[in-house]
Amino acid sequence: MEDLMTSYSFTEKKRIRKDFGKQRSILEVPFLLAIQVDSYREFLQEDVEPNKRKDLGLHAALKSVFPISSYSGNAALEYVGYKLGEPVFDERECRQRGMSYGAPLRVTVRLVIYDRESSTKAIKYVKEQEVYLGEIPLMTENGTFIVNGTERVIVSQLHRSPGVFFDHDRGKTHSSGKLLYSARIIPYRGSWLDFEFDPKDALFTRIDRRRKLPVSILLRALGYNNEEMLAEFFEINTFHINPDEGVQLELVPERLRGETLNFDLADGDKVIVEAGKRITARHVKQLEAAGVAALAVPDDYLVGRILSHDVVDGSTGELLANANDEISEDQLAAFRKAGVDAVGTLWVNDLDRGPYLSNTLRIDPTKTQLEALVEIYRMMRPGEPPTKEAAQNLFHNLFFTFERYDLSTVGRMKFNHRVGRKEVLGESVLYDKKYFAERNDEESKRLVAEHADTSDILEVIKVLTEIRNGRGVVDDIDHLGNRRVRSVGEMAENVFRVGLVRVERAVKERLSMAESEGLTPQELINAKPVAAAIKEFFGSSQLSRFMDQNNPLSEVTHKRRVSALGPGGLTRERAGFEVRDVHPTHYGRVCTIETPEGPNIGLINSLAVFARTNQYGFLETPYRKVLDGKVSDDVEYLSAIEENEYVIAQANALTDAKNMLTEQFVPCRFQGESLLKPPAEVHFMDVSPMQTVSVAAALVPFLEHDDANRALMGANMQRQAVPTLRSQKPLVGTGIERAVARDSGVTVNARRGGVIEQIDAARIVVKVNEAEIGGGTDAGVDIYNLIKYTRSNQNTCINQRPLVNVGDVIARGDVLADGPSTDIGELALGQNMLIAFMPWNGYNFEDSILLSERVVEEDRYTTIHIEELTCVARDTKLGPEEISADIPNVSEQALNRLDESGVVYIGAEVRAGDIMVGKVTPKGESQLTPEEKLLRAIFGEKASDVKDSSLRVPPGMDGTVIDVQVFTRDGIEKDKRARQIEESEIKRVKKDFDDQFRILEAAIYARLRSQIVGKVANGGPNLKKGDNVTDAYLDGLKKSDWFQLRMKDDDAADAIERAQKQIQAHEKEFEARFADKRGKITQGDDLAPGVLKMVKVFLAVKRRIQPGDKMAGRHGNKGVVSNVVPVEDMPYMATGEPVDIVLNPLGVPSRMNIGQILEVHLGWAAKGLGRKIQRMLEAQTAVSELRKFLDDIYNHDSAINAERVDLSQFSDEELLNLGKNLIDGVPMATPVFDGASEAEIKRMLELAELPQSGQTQLYDGRTGEAFDRKTTVGYMHYLKLNHLVDDKMHARSTGPYSLVTQQPLGGKAQFGGQRFGEMEVWALEAYGAAYTLQEMLTVKSDDVQGRNQMYKNIVDGEHEMVAGMPESFNVLVKEIRSLAINMELEE
């Protein structure tokens, strides 16, 4: 195998993963958010010039609705083009202010007025104008939308592709179990058309699932008569009638097969088939060989056959028999009498030529096209009287106009493919040559001119009858070739189109007035319906979800979701087993592992790592080409339909050095089956072993050793991991951690290469390489502002930390700063913990987890959660609410954290119940209690007309205030605190801009210096003509005076001029940007109606790990912390090192997730190698020895492994730096389905000088005694999940009651009580605890008088109770009375 050396970037050199993969990667992991980003980019086509836009997205929607003509046709509104403006607020400002991030859409339309008087269409005048059509939400670069200040994701939908589908009822409709076949034409929008057989083999049709009609009615409405229908669907046998006796059949031998004749079949004198014998294929061959053209048959052979045409007496014109009649003896006699010499009959038999259409015609009541149209009208609009025009229009609008019916390009492609046509393109309406030829409007003439003699509806019925006849197969609805993905862009386009159609109706009404009243396009178009439709879709559609933002992985997974639910999709209740099941076509397209547990199982899926959608929306997966057994590196993407024709080998098929398949029989997949094929018959091969799984499943190491159900839990639980205080890379990973972190957008990556110029906790400044600097005003400085301590959707903390130092040389794409759950640019969801598998005093019973106190002490699982609390001051009927520190009846101590405006200080530590924002509400006059009267008498009026409605810290929460935002309505004066916040914000922005400008300026001057030093000058400040410009001279000059230099060299002179222009341009630009920012900060805020002021307070809550918190590994091994034990009591190793976590060994065998054991072994080896490197560094070993040891770790089995690590690229200093980063453990990658083998794990343990069994002797921390046997010990990456006991634990003494039942509310959110439910009542009944039970049902619950009295009694020290009537009983009595049953209680 050739050595595959990769060159390492600045970031990658810091820490290298040892990769155990045997397969070299053909494809890099693609951009993981492409499905979202690309789809929306196509929808907007923002960076495409208007005249070059493709027929997609907004452009397509606008083109499909415009031009709009008035009813009279004298005025029309035409579409010219559109452009998107600049968003008013950027993403950060939208999040802060609770706005939606979007840009205004301006559409250019042209109003054309035609001259009424002229006979031809002469244009009277034209007016072109730009019309505002509302805000279009913009996607952030991470594939999300910001709607009302929160990040949302539009999930892609997997729905049934438009086209035609053939199916049967699986024998469920009829008691006999007969299969009833059906066909359904599903358009992209418009009416569904179904065809179905009934148990008597007649064909029916339904429109939009209404009542069924015989299919001949539909064909008659299209303009076919009985003879034409029969000719389309049947082959005709021709009989010549002899004038006196007998009949001659024009013989087609094939058609006789399977019949039994009651006369001898002879060729001349030679009998071929005797009477009563069945005719076989051999007989047919003999007949063909004999060349028999006509066959004399008796009359009764013709009787009972079905006529294919009307029979008319030639002389009198009398109708002797109708098409589709069964010929009787009388009719045959009449034919002879009238001198009819030939008749045609339908060739039918019971086996494979059923008389279905013939049966249908017998039950069809209609005779003419008009009758058929009326019948369809009655079915669609029952109870309305039909007129000829109405019936014709209704039928035409159902399937034949683009306004009402659209198959779409996908639908047409699928339709043509299924009915066996070669061409892919076609009309997006149903086309029928005969129907359109009879109409004479422009559109119909165009269609007829462009198309061949085809009929879509006839062809579907033909395929359906063929399937019924036993030729052809039905479709599998769950095949991914019949389901397609609808992404954001397409859904937004549909919604936009719906809005436009609503606008179109209104415009049509107004267009008639446009001419007389001289209206402009702006007055004609009302943008509200479009804006409303879009807002509704992004804000409250079923597929617009609140983004799951627990950690970077959950963001990426959420955007790669594919849901079968949603508008036009399935519903949970109706979805059966088949839809939810794994289908062979899921391979490489949709993850076979990751799906939710519960009611949505199988309906919500995740895209596989390499999957993408093609132009039609079908999922494709990449394969390597194989030619004559040689595997090439050419990659082809195949959809599920295309894949059907090929034999595909697995990714791990054995190949030799020349890439030839070596096995005699290769395990392959073909048409959904697994089989063995010789190498010559293989067409394709998988690109990667992780092709079948999604991102989350591909992050589970040793996935191949886990049971599928546990792997599913493992993949799902990784998404719930909370980012810890200090992230730790997993010691055992799979090698795609870096790709996930990169694409999730939580890290800061360098846009261009360069040198780090300046850095602090919140900002990184890069001076860009000369080569990467663009022209114009680009000054070559990139400034990255980091996100500090902001709140995610799940209240976890988002914070970015710089990874670089001043002077570091970086390249494009390098990681400059880590985000939440990332460690040097790699995904790091949990912590590497030292784990022992052993029982410990019952503390790990039933998956419980025993923790060491050291874990808590070192803050390994301490997480920061940020809570947002909002206080709103409204205008009430009694006057405005007021935010102030002057609150009645509140102690001085309770207000000591508030400033004079009544808002809490930043940095204050608050506990449950503390006031954070003081607010008073005016209250109406009420009956005063004697105490209040006394107070009034003493203190005067003021004390009682306001009540305290301050924002307090909710129960069970304490933390530190980290940010306060005050929003004030426009036109209301800002308070002191708001002004302070505003000033500090303006200061911050100014400093940012000043720094940026200073750095830009310095960069421009530095570049200019390099261009003019050493050149000859023609003069300048203190410089003679002919002198050279030197560094010293420039240092002595004021920067602004450099521009007075006059250079001899033209290039140098140009450079000075260019630099001056650049600096002036930047100065202007910065001033404008600062003015804009300042304006936004100082302007009033757009608040909800009736809101005067809003204060948002952000609390940072620190949560340590504690009993009751849920934790999990990556293999579905989840548990709850049962106890935290002192370090000295934990089991310890011979070295004296205590373990961190003790897990129950019984959790492994029955769950069959052995991956965790292998992870523990390999993790131990990784840690051991790190310790060995640490010892070498401490002993100051020679660099060459360290290099040799690292080479041994990374490349010892490079004969079988794919990638080698080239350590010669590292300088000694870089190597030492790498060594320092490996002290914590050498990270390993064992890719999914291609991971480390047992031998390799043992080899690593050996290198680390650890026992190869992976087990060691542990000692009891309490007694110091050795345990009876050795224990499996090692490092596992363990996660803390977002199911924290602090969020779930809840207690209440007094609190809110429900008004009707007078019982406490339920649930933590309502601060509710504990329900003493029916099972608890049964328990007390069973014990006979009558008094306790009475107390529970009355005074402790809803007996109002009793509980008030009880309170007084306790205060007075009398411990007795009087139980009265529970309020819920009164409610019951009232409900019974509402049923008009009187019920009274008697003493």
From Swiss-Prot:
CDD domains: RNA_pol_B_RPB2. InterPro entries: DNA-dir_RNA_pol_bsu_ext_1_sf (IPR042107), DNA-dir_RNA_pol_bsu_external_1 (IPR019462), DNA-dir_RNA_pol_su2 (IPR015712), DNA-dir_RNAP_su2_dom (IPR007120), DNA-dir_RNAP_su2_hyb_sf (IPR037033), RNA_pol_bsu_bac (IPR010243), RNA_pol_bsu_CS (IPR007121), RNA_pol_bsu_protrusion (IPR007644). The keyword Transcription regulation does not apply. GO terms for cellular component: DNA-directed RNA polymerase complex. The keyword Protein biosynthesis does not apply. GO terms for biological process: DNA-templated transcription. Disulfide bonds: none annotated. It is an enzyme of class 2 (transferase). Keywords: DNA-directed RNA polymerase, Nucleotidyltransferase, Transcription, Transferase. Pfam families: RNA_pol_Rpb2_1 (PF04563), RNA_pol_Rpb2_2 (PF04561), RNA_pol_Rpb2_3 (PF04565), RNA_pol_Rpb2_45 (PF10385), RNA_pol_Rpb2_6 (PF00562), RNA_pol_Rpb2_7 (PF04560). Its EC number is 2.7.7.6. One of its GO terms (molecular function) is DNA-directed RNA polymerase activity. It catalyses: RNA(n) + a ribonucleoside 5'-triphosphate = RNA(n+1) + diphosphate. It comes from the Bacteria. DNA-dependent RNA polymerase catalyzes the transcription of DNA into RNA using the four ribonucleoside triphosphates as substrates. The RNAP catalytic core consists of 2 alpha, 1 beta, 1 beta' and 1 omega subunit. When a sigma factor is associated with the core the holoenzyme is formed, which can initiate transcription. Belongs to the RNA polymerase beta chain family. This is DNA-directed RNA polymerase subunit beta. It comes from Xanthomonas campestris pv. campestris (strain 8004). The lineage of its organism: Bacteria, Pseudomonadati, Pseudomonadota, Gammaproteobacteria, Lysobacterales.
